Amino acid sequence: MQSSAVFSASPSLPLLKPGRLSLRHPVTASSNLSVSPPNVVSVPPLPRRSWRLASSDSPLRAWSGLPSVSSPSLDTNRFKTAATAVPEEGEGSGKMTKVLELGLLFAMWYLFNIYFNIYNKQVLKALHAPMTVTLVQFAVGSVLITFMWALNLYKRPKISAAQLAAILPLAVVHTLGNLFTNMSLGKVSVSFTHTIKAMEPFFSVVLSAMFLGEVPTPWVIGSIIPIVGGVALASVTEVSFNWAGFLSAMASNLTNQSRNVLSKKVMVKKDDSLDNITLFSIITLMSLFLMAPVTFFSEGIKFTPSYIQSAGVNVQQIYTKSLIAALCFHAYQQVSYMILARVSPVTHSVGNCVKRVVVIVSSVIFFKTPVSPVNAFGTGIALAGVFLYSRVKRIKPKPKTA
């Protein structure tokens, strides 16, 4: 009886014959089960089976009636892994957002430049008053700056008299640089003006060596050679060449690079309220006051409807194109400083080189400027030299070992 009771309680119940389970033995089996040794009933193997099931992420874990001791730790590990994966995904999306934002800024920079050069050229060709056009551009920029400061769209700076005195030379050369550029655009094609302006690195190297004592590296000197050679080749073969336009563009290079040298020489002290955009805004306001008396004394008042009509030009078109050109002039310089705050100076220089290529190509297409193969080759060499200069100017010479 004892052996049969133990046998009937074993896990192999399906092997029993149905005829042996009768009502004659209803109680003896359960009474013997209470004294069975633990090694007879096969319960211990079950936790090992439930351990293997609990180690997976499948829904079969709920099928086990015995909780696993390691389950909470495994859940915690999975929670930590998921928690650390979320910031990485957020960082990736954040980087992608910054890249898209930077790409949008570069596109705006190039687009504003294209529109400025096209509309500015049309106004200068019709009006023949570069000083008046330059004054209008400074005036529109000053109105925008005042509007931003009045509405607190940009923080209004607190400038001391000493800082204004230090900024004044920068405003003078900034005014002259834009005036000479407009004088050149009024005399020669847009593509030729920007080809000549590709010689800015040459003036930068010469002025930095003269006033700052910066000796150029052989790499920099090597990059200047194709710039000078390309501009010379393009100038010889330029259809619209005249000395007034050529010398005006050269003077623009000289004044613009003098501004960069002066900014290093004067060392304007900057605080939190005087960043690049604020400095540009102050220079624009000062340029307006510098340009106004010179314009009225030299050209008089030529932006009136009566004068424009006497020149045989549509008044509304001149006003509209002048306004668009002035807005684009101020916008592309603001965007340029925004890009400079996000990238390295080398990247900004490369972007500026690409911008010049885009402006030259777009102006040639829009104005249908005749370009000979030799002229295009010279322009290409000059721009390639500018690109090379932007890459090698940051290379520092190796220190001499004793």
UniProtKB/Swiss-Prot annotation:
It is a multi-pass membrane protein. Disulfide bonds: none annotated. One of its GO terms (molecular function) is organophosphate ester transmembrane transporter activity. SUPFAM superfamilies: Multidrug resistance efflux transporter EmrE. Residues 83-98, 153-209, 299-374 are chloroplast intermembrane. Residues 120-131, 231-278, 395-402 are lumenal. PANTHER family: SOLUTE CARRIER FAMILY 35. Mediates the export of fixed carbons from the chloroplasts into the cytosol in the form of triose phosphates. Homodimer. This is Triose phosphate/phosphate translocator, non-green plastid, chloroplastic. It comes from Brassica oleracea var. botrytis.
